[in-house]
Amino acid sequence: MKAKRCVCSPGYIRQGSLSRRFTREEFQRLTDEERERLGLRTLSSAPCTLPPAKPAGSGEGLSVEGLTCAFQKREAVFRELSFSVRPGEVVAVTGPNGVGKTTLSRCLCGLLREQAGTVRLHGRPLGRKERQRAAFCVMQDVNHQLFSDSVWGECRISAPDAPDEKIAEVLDRLQLLSFRERHPMALSGGQKQRLAVATALLSEKPVLIFDEPTSGLDYARMVEVSGVIRDLARQGRIVLVVTHDQEFLQQACDRVLHL
Protein backbone atom coordinates (compact mmCIF):
# COMPACT_ATOMS: atom_id res chain seq x y z
CA MET A 1 0.00 0.00 0.00
CA LYS A 2 1.39 3.38 -0.96
CA ALA A 3 1.64 5.81 1.93
CA LYS A 4 -0.17 9.12 1.55
CA ARG A 5 1.58 12.33 2.45
CA CYS A 6 -0.29 14.79 4.64
CA VAL A 7 0.56 18.45 3.98
CA CYS A 8 -0.52 21.00 6.58
CA SER A 9 -0.67 24.71 5.84
CA PRO A 10 -0.93 27.58 8.36
CA GLY A 11 -4.38 29.05 8.94
CA TYR A 12 -5.60 32.19 10.70
CA ILE A 13 -8.53 31.72 13.07
CA ARG A 14 -10.60 34.77 13.99
CA GLN A 15 -13.44 34.65 16.54
CA GLY A 16 -13.49 30.87 16.37
CA SER A 17 -13.61 30.55 12.57
CA LEU A 18 -10.91 29.87 10.01
CA SER A 19 -10.81 33.16 8.10
CA ARG A 20 -7.66 32.79 6.04
CA ARG A 21 -5.31 30.05 4.91
CA PHE A 22 -1.65 30.61 3.97
CA THR A 23 0.85 28.60 2.02
CA ARG A 24 4.15 28.24 3.86
CA GLU A 25 5.75 30.76 1.50
CA GLU A 26 2.95 33.30 2.02
CA PHE A 27 3.20 32.94 5.78
CA GLN A 28 6.98 33.43 5.76
CA ARG A 29 6.62 36.55 3.57
CA LEU A 30 4.37 38.37 6.04
CA THR A 31 5.88 41.70 7.05
CA ASP A 32 6.17 42.58 10.75
CA GLU A 33 3.32 45.08 10.29
CA GLU A 34 1.04 42.45 8.72
CA ARG A 35 1.95 39.87 11.35
CA GLU A 36 1.28 42.26 14.22
CA ARG A 37 -2.04 43.35 12.68
CA LEU A 38 -3.09 39.69 12.64
CA GLY A 39 -2.00 39.30 16.26
CA LEU A 40 0.74 36.77 15.42
CA ARG A 41 4.05 36.35 17.23
CA THR A 42 7.42 36.68 15.52
CA LEU A 43 8.92 33.66 13.76
CA SER A 44 12.50 34.66 14.57
CA SER A 45 14.28 35.19 17.87
CA ALA A 46 16.41 38.33 17.93
CA PRO A 47 19.42 38.32 20.29
CA CYS A 48 18.94 40.13 23.59
CA THR A 49 20.48 43.62 23.56
CA LEU A 50 19.54 44.68 27.10
CA PRO A 51 22.23 45.64 29.64
CA PRO A 52 22.84 43.31 32.60
CA ALA A 53 21.16 43.75 35.98
CA LYS A 54 23.00 46.06 38.34
CA PRO A 55 25.19 44.64 41.14
CA ALA A 56 23.92 44.46 44.71
CA GLY A 57 23.86 47.76 46.58
CA SER A 58 22.60 49.39 49.78
CA GLY A 59 20.43 52.10 48.22
CA GLU A 60 16.83 52.25 47.05
CA GLY A 61 15.22 49.15 45.63
CA LEU A 62 15.67 45.41 45.99
CA SER A 63 19.20 44.15 46.64
CA VAL A 64 20.11 40.46 46.58
CA GLU A 65 23.48 39.64 48.14
CA GLY A 66 25.19 36.24 48.02
CA LEU A 67 21.92 34.32 47.71
CA THR A 68 22.10 30.51 47.72
CA CYS A 69 18.91 28.47 47.28
CA ALA A 70 17.98 24.81 46.99
CA PHE A 71 14.72 23.15 45.95
CA GLN A 72 13.16 20.58 48.30
CA LYS A 73 16.35 20.30 50.42
CA ARG A 74 18.41 19.09 47.47
CA GLU A 75 21.75 20.43 46.28
CA ALA A 76 21.80 24.19 45.75
CA VAL A 77 20.27 25.29 42.46
CA PHE A 78 22.38 28.45 42.43
CA ARG A 79 25.03 29.86 44.76
CA GLU A 80 26.08 33.36 45.86
CA LEU A 81 23.78 35.19 43.44
CA SER A 82 23.96 38.98 43.70
CA PHE A 83 22.08 41.71 41.81
CA SER A 84 19.74 44.65 42.41
CA VAL A 85 16.55 46.11 40.94
CA ARG A 86 15.71 49.78 41.36
CA PRO A 87 12.18 51.20 41.66
CA GLY A 88 10.89 51.87 38.16
CA GLU A 89 12.98 49.10 36.58
CA VAL A 90 11.82 45.89 34.94
CA VAL A 91 14.50 43.19 35.11
CA ALA A 92 14.14 39.99 33.09
CA VAL A 93 15.41 36.72 34.59
CA THR A 94 16.42 34.33 31.82
CA GLY A 95 18.36 31.12 31.34
CA PRO A 96 17.94 27.46 30.40
CA ASN A 97 15.44 25.21 32.14
CA GLY A 98 16.64 23.96 35.51
CA VAL A 99 19.01 26.82 36.41
CA GLY A 100 16.76 28.14 39.20
CA LYS A 101 14.62 30.92 37.74
CA THR A 102 11.41 29.80 39.43
CA THR A 103 13.33 28.88 42.60
CA LEU A 104 14.67 32.45 42.70
CA SER A 105 11.19 33.94 42.31
CA ARG A 106 9.81 31.71 45.09
CA CYS A 107 12.66 32.69 47.40
CA LEU A 108 12.29 36.42 46.74
CA CYS A 109 8.59 36.37 47.59
CA GLY A 110 9.14 34.33 50.75
CA LEU A 111 7.71 31.00 49.60
CA LEU A 112 11.11 29.32 49.87
CA ARG A 113 13.79 29.75 52.51
CA GLU A 114 17.29 30.69 51.35
CA GLN A 115 20.32 28.65 52.47
CA ALA A 116 22.56 31.70 52.58
CA GLY A 117 22.58 35.35 51.60
CA THR A 118 20.55 38.48 52.27
CA VAL A 119 17.60 40.14 50.55
CA ARG A 120 17.23 43.86 51.27
CA LEU A 121 14.45 46.29 50.40
CA HIS A 122 15.51 49.95 50.47
CA GLY A 123 18.55 48.96 52.53
CA ARG A 124 16.67 46.96 55.18
CA PRO A 125 17.18 43.16 55.41
CA LEU A 126 13.95 41.20 54.88
CA GLY A 127 13.23 37.85 56.47
CA ARG A 128 11.02 35.28 54.82
CA LYS A 129 7.77 36.54 56.41
CA GLU A 130 8.60 40.14 55.57
CA ARG A 131 9.21 39.18 51.94
CA GLN A 132 5.78 37.56 51.82
CA ARG A 133 4.25 40.89 52.83
CA ALA A 134 6.37 42.96 50.44
CA ALA A 135 6.28 40.84 47.27
CA PHE A 136 3.59 39.44 44.97
CA CYS A 137 4.37 36.58 42.60
CA VAL A 138 2.31 35.63 39.55
CA MET A 139 3.11 31.95 39.07
CA GLN A 140 3.58 30.20 35.75
CA ASP A 141 0.66 27.89 36.58
CA VAL A 142 -1.86 30.46 37.79
CA ASN A 143 -4.44 27.77 38.64
CA HIS A 144 -2.66 27.51 42.01
CA GLN A 145 -3.44 31.11 42.94
CA LEU A 146 -7.01 31.69 41.79
CA PHE A 147 -9.41 31.13 44.69
CA SER A 148 -12.61 33.13 44.23
CA ASP A 149 -15.83 32.12 42.45
CA SER A 150 -15.70 35.13 40.11
CA VAL A 151 -13.20 37.32 38.27
CA TRP A 152 -14.38 40.33 40.25
CA GLY A 153 -14.08 38.47 43.54
CA GLU A 154 -10.52 37.44 42.67
CA CYS A 155 -9.57 41.08 42.25
CA ARG A 156 -11.33 42.02 45.48
CA ILE A 157 -9.22 39.47 47.41
CA SER A 158 -6.05 41.29 46.29
CA ALA A 159 -7.50 44.76 46.82
CA PRO A 160 -10.19 44.67 49.54
CA ASP A 161 -10.27 48.47 49.86
CA ALA A 162 -9.93 49.43 46.19
CA PRO A 163 -12.78 51.46 44.65
CA ASP A 164 -14.95 49.54 42.20
CA GLU A 165 -13.88 51.99 39.50
CA LYS A 166 -10.22 51.01 39.96
CA ILE A 167 -10.96 47.29 39.62
CA ALA A 168 -13.14 47.93 36.57
CA GLU A 169 -10.37 50.01 34.98
CA VAL A 170 -7.79 47.25 35.44
CA LEU A 171 -10.09 44.51 34.14
CA ASP A 172 -11.10 46.63 31.16
CA ARG A 173 -7.48 47.26 30.23
CA LEU A 174 -6.79 43.53 30.27
CA GLN A 175 -9.93 42.70 28.26
CA LEU A 176 -11.55 40.95 31.23
CA LEU A 177 -14.34 43.31 32.31
CA SER A 178 -17.02 41.47 30.32
CA PHE A 179 -16.06 38.31 32.26
CA ARG A 180 -16.38 39.92 35.70
CA GLU A 181 -18.98 37.36 36.88
CA ARG A 182 -17.26 34.37 35.26
CA HIS A 183 -15.67 31.71 37.48
CA PRO A 184 -11.85 31.91 37.06
CA MET A 185 -11.64 28.19 36.29
CA ALA A 186 -14.00 28.74 33.33
CA LEU A 187 -11.57 31.18 31.68
CA SER A 188 -9.12 30.27 28.95
CA GLY A 189 -5.45 29.85 29.84
CA GLY A 190 -4.57 33.30 28.52
CA GLN A 191 -7.47 34.91 30.38
CA LYS A 192 -6.38 33.25 33.64
CA GLN A 193 -2.88 34.60 33.07
CA ARG A 194 -4.22 38.13 32.56
CA LEU A 195 -6.44 37.82 35.64
CA ALA A 196 -3.38 36.94 37.74
CA VAL A 197 -1.61 39.99 36.30
CA ALA A 198 -4.64 42.10 37.27
CA THR A 199 -4.49 40.86 40.87
CA ALA A 200 -0.78 41.72 41.03
CA LEU A 201 -1.46 45.21 39.74
CA LEU A 202 -4.19 45.75 42.34
CA SER A 203 -2.15 44.36 45.25
CA GLU A 204 -0.17 47.60 45.79
CA LYS A 205 2.87 45.58 46.92
CA PRO A 206 6.24 47.21 46.11
CA VAL A 207 7.89 44.09 44.61
CA LEU A 208 6.16 42.24 41.78
CA ILE A 209 7.48 39.01 40.27
CA PHE A 210 6.01 37.47 37.11
CA ASP A 211 6.87 33.89 36.10
CA GLU A 212 6.35 33.51 32.32
CA PRO A 213 3.46 36.05 32.17
CA THR A 214 3.10 35.83 28.37
CA SER A 215 3.00 32.04 28.09
CA GLY A 216 0.30 31.14 25.55
CA LEU A 217 -0.55 34.75 24.67
CA ASP A 218 -0.88 36.03 21.11
CA TYR A 219 0.84 39.23 19.98
CA ALA A 220 -2.00 41.60 20.92
CA ARG A 221 -2.37 40.18 24.43
CA MET A 222 1.41 40.12 24.88
CA VAL A 223 1.52 43.84 24.05
CA GLU A 224 -1.26 44.50 26.60
CA VAL A 225 0.61 42.66 29.36
CA SER A 226 3.84 44.42 28.36
CA GLY A 227 2.10 47.79 28.67
CA VAL A 228 0.71 46.94 32.11
CA ILE A 229 4.14 45.88 33.36
CA ARG A 230 5.71 49.08 32.02
CA ASP A 231 2.99 51.09 33.80
CA LEU A 232 3.76 49.28 37.06
CA ALA A 233 7.40 50.28 36.71
CA ARG A 234 6.42 53.90 36.02
CA GLN A 235 4.47 53.83 39.30
CA GLY A 236 7.76 53.08 41.09
CA ARG A 237 7.23 49.34 41.58
CA ILE A 238 10.17 46.92 41.54
CA VAL A 239 9.45 44.37 38.81
CA LEU A 240 11.15 41.08 37.94
CA VAL A 241 9.99 38.91 35.05
CA VAL A 242 11.03 35.29 34.56
CA THR A 243 10.73 34.73 30.81
CA HIS A 244 11.94 32.85 27.75
CA ASP A 245 9.94 35.22 25.52
CA GLN A 246 12.51 37.34 23.67
CA GLU A 247 9.86 39.40 21.88
CA PHE A 248 8.25 40.34 25.19
CA LEU A 249 11.63 40.83 26.89
CA GLN A 250 12.70 43.45 24.36
CA GLN A 251 9.37 45.31 24.72
CA ALA A 252 8.89 45.29 28.48
CA CYS A 253 12.26 44.99 30.23
CA ASP A 254 15.12 47.40 31.01
CA ARG A 255 17.82 44.96 32.12
CA VAL A 256 18.43 41.23 32.14
CA LEU A 257 19.78 38.76 34.71
CA HIS A 258 21.17 35.64 33.03
CA LEU A 259 21.25 32.59 35.32
Question: Where are the language model's segments positioned?
Answer:
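Catalytic Walker B motif of ABC-type/P-loop ATPase nucleotide-binding domains
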Residues: L208-D211
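Conserved ABC ATPase "signature" region
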Residues: D164-F179
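Helix-to-loop junction immediately C-terminal to a conserved catalytic motif
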Residues: C109
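The feature captures the beta-strand-to-loop junction immediately N-terminal to the Walker
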Residues: T94-P96
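Conserved ABC transporter NBD signature motif
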Residues: G117-R131
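ABC-family nucleotide-binding domains
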Residues: D218
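Conserved ABC ATPase signature
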Residues: H183-L187, Q191
